[in-house]
């Protein structure tokens, strides 16, 4: 099985490698550009520019260089269509894309001085050549084509719709119409400003995300990915349904540093899925367990697919606050997934792996202790010392490179061969990190088009009116509409771009319409809500790209794999609905340690009971009425106030005109619900 697993891994890696069609000089050029990009990002994050007073970059120019690298590499590694080779035309487009970005770097001061007025060059007596309009237009078009090649059509279609809406706003339905932006204003705002394509999302990509992806690539090339997987098998391989539990644990550990549930599925699934199949899981269930665990890896602090840093910037809170609130739902969701794998093993009467196939726990743990040092450095600096994410990940990356050097020197008796291996591993890590960032960086930049369109047209305000008109005071309809939009908008996007798109459109809407309906939703709860359901798009058929990746490895049916993964992920889907109403699940309003323990215990019990209900199994198969009882118990445990309010309402509602006849207790809370007419008189 080990040989088979290695063959599968090699085949999948070959199929998904961005450089699979490259050879000779072309491959060397791509590798060189990728390595230079990684070095630039390390320099930008380091304290050296300030120490030497050299090579300092302002925000917008740094973002432009970042996207310039991504666009250049995109056209050098992704052909115009599958089966084609990179042509001279592709190389030309990559140069034009790079120039469109570098123009911002070279002429940044002039752009600031002109305050948004685009430069035109007068030719002859009267003809004006709108040079910046042309550069910006080329930049946007090239970005969209790069997105089509690297990510796919869905995000391109969404971005084009928002661009058309920005320009033709006056022709839109009255409820969302606006005056429309001129072509100059549209291109200038989208390409030459730092509110759209070069806005907060790509700023976070420059500051943090690239380095996290680079950290993951360096860890993988040093052998960290294999170590975590071996450790997972050593810990749980002998348990009932051990390979499934190992897949969950391994995906959780690699998901801590991975920026994509699809990449996570491929990385760990090439090892775990064949072994799950061998021990008795069906093709679809093996793939679905891997998909569910990989998606769960993206909601796990401290990194959360790098979306945690964007979330902190969007909400205006510290990174630590985001991690603190996201911690409990992620942990109990993961424990519930372990429970699912156990229930499946009970259903199928599966045993654990044979002793001979399971690595020795002590030897395995000790063999890779050095991999834990840079991860400890990262978490210690982020969570305990509360340093910035860019500062923390820079020093974690440097510590990883140095720790790997020391390990190889000791392992190879301080020989020159050790230095050679270390240098090669580091260079390959730099190359892989940059190539892995191409799709992520481009997706985030294109998501910036949507952010810019929402900001420049007032669309979020109009969306509030539209959804309020549809949902009225019915919070169920409001949440249903939000979930559907998140699933549609999150199709096929990397985790961070996914969050940027759904949060920019839906977060404000959910807060405002929720308030109008009499519900006060904390901002962090709303952002985590849209983040969770945006991620569910990776699982949910018919798109569910992570399910397709798992099916490619397992040989199963992609649609059946997706449906099974969706069913497994119901526990992840219920949590954001619960924590919108029960804020204690996000550790909001916790008064002391005992209060926290009660919340953690009841939440964990609730999600496990809910999982049993959805899987129809406890110690044995549940009858239909037992499933209903389990669901009621789970809701009571997850949201006690919701159930108590049905029997003992927290508030005694009175009409305003009767308020004078009510004797108010000065020690009790009073809430006023204020309604306002919609633009349509409702």
Give the positions of each predicted feature.
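Long, contiguous bundles of hydrophobic transmembrane helices that form the permeation core
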Residues: 1-25, 34-35, 324-436, 548-638, ...
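Hydrophobic transmembrane alpha-helices that form the pore/transport pathway of multi-pass ion
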Residues: 229-297, 303-308, 316, 495-534, ...
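Flexible hinge motifs at transmembrane-helix junctions and intramembrane kinks/re-entrant loops
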Residues: 144-179, 200-201, 222, 226, ...
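Low-complexity, proline/glycine-enriched hydrophobic segments characteristic of transmembrane helices
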Residues: 516-519, 642-682
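Hydrophobic transmembrane alpha-helices
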Residues: 215-218, 253-254, 295-300, 443, ...
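Conserved, well-structured core domains of diverse proteins
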Residues: 1-127, 133-137, 634, 638
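Core transmembrane alpha-helical segments of multi-pass membrane transporters/permeases
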Residues: 145, 150, 160-172, 183, ...
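Membrane-interfacial loop-to-helix junctions in multi-pass transporters
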Residues: 129-134, 195-208, 235-247, 279-285, ...
């Amino acid at each position: 099985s080990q040989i088979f697993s290695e063959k599968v891994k090699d085949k999948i890696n070959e199929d998904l490698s961005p450089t699979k069609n490259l050879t000779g000089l072309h491959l060397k050029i791509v590798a060189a550009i990728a390595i230079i990009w990684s070095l630039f990002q390390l320099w930008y994050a380091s304290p050296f520019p300030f120490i030497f007073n050299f090579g300092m970059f302002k925000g917008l120019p740094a973002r432009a260089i970042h996207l310039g690298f991504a666009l250049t590499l995109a056209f050098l590694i992704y052909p115009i269509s599958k089966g084609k080779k990179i042509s001279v035309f592709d190389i030309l487009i990559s140069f034009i894309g790079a120039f469109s970005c570098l123009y911002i770097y070279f002429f940044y001061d002039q752009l600031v001085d002109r305050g948004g007025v685009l430069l035109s060059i007068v030719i002859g007596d009267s003809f004006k050549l709108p040079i910046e309009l042309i550069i910006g237009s080329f930049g946007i078009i090239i970005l969209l084509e790069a997105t089509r090649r690297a990510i796919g059509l869905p995000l391109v279609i969404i971005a084009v719709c928002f661009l058309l809406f920005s320009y033709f706003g006056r022709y839109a339905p009255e409820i969302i119409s606006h005056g429309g932006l001129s072509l100059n204003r549209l291109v200038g705002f989208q390409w030459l400003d730092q509110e759209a394509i070069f806005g907060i999302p790509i700023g976070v990509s420059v500051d943090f995300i690239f380095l996290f992806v680079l950290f993951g690539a360096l860890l993988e090339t040093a052998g960290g990915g294999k170590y975590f997987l071996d450790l997972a098998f050593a810990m749980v391989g002998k348990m009932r349904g051990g390979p499934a539990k190992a897949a969950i644990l391994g995906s959780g550990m690699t998901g801590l540093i991975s920026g994509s549930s699809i990449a996570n599925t491929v990385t760990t699934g090439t090892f775990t899925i064949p072994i799950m199949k061998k021990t008795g899981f069906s093709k679809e269930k093996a793939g679905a367990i891997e998909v569910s665990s990989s998606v769960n890896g993206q909601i796990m602090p401290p990194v959360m697919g790098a979306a945690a840093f964007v979330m902190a910037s969007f909400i205006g809170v510290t990174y630590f606050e985001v991690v603190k609130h996201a911690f409990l739902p992620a942990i109990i969701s993961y424990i519930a997934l372990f429970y699912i794998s156990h229930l499946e093993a009970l259903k199928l009467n599966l045993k654990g792996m044979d002793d001979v196939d399971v690595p020795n726990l002590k030897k395995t743990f000790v063999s890779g202790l050095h991999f834990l040092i840079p991860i400890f450095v990262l978490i210690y600096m982020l969570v305990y010392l509360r340093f910035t994410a860019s500062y923390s990940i820079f020093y974690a990356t440097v510590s990883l490179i140095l720790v790997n050097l020391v390990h190889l020197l000791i392992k190879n008796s301080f020989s020159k061969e050790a230095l050679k291996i270390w240098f090669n591993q580091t260079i390959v890590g730099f190359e892989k990190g940059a190539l892995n960032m191409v799709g992520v960086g481009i997706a985030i930049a294109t998501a910036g088009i949507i952010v810019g369109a929402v900001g420049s047209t007032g669309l979020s305000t109009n969306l509030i009116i539209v959804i309020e008109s549809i949902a009225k005071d019915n919070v169920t309809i409001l949440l249903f509409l939000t979930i559907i939009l998140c699933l549609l908008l999150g199709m096929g996007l990397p985790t961070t771009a996914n969050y940027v798109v759904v949060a920019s459109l839906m977060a404000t809407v959910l807060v405002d319409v929720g308030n109008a309906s009499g519900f006060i939703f904390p901002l962090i709860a709303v952002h985590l809500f849209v983040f969770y359901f945006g991620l569910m798009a990776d699982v949910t058929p018919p798109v569910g790209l992570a399910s397709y990746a798992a099916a490619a490895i397992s040989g199963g049916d992609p649609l059946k794999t997706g449906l099974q993964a969706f069913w497994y992920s119901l526990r992840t889907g219920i949590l954001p609905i619960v924590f919108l109403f029960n804020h204690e699940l996000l550790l909001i309003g916790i008064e002391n340690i005992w209060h926290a323990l009660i919340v953690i215990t009841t939440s964990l019990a609730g999600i496990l009971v809910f999982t049993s209900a959805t899987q129809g199994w406890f110690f044995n198969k549940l009858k239909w009425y037992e499933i209903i009882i389990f669901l009621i118990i789970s809701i009571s445990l997850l949201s006690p106030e919701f159930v108590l309010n049905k029997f003992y309402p927290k508030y005694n509602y009175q009409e305003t005109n009767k308020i004078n006849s009510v004797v108010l207790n000065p020690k009790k809370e009073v809430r006023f619900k204020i309604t306002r007419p919609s633009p349509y008189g409702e």
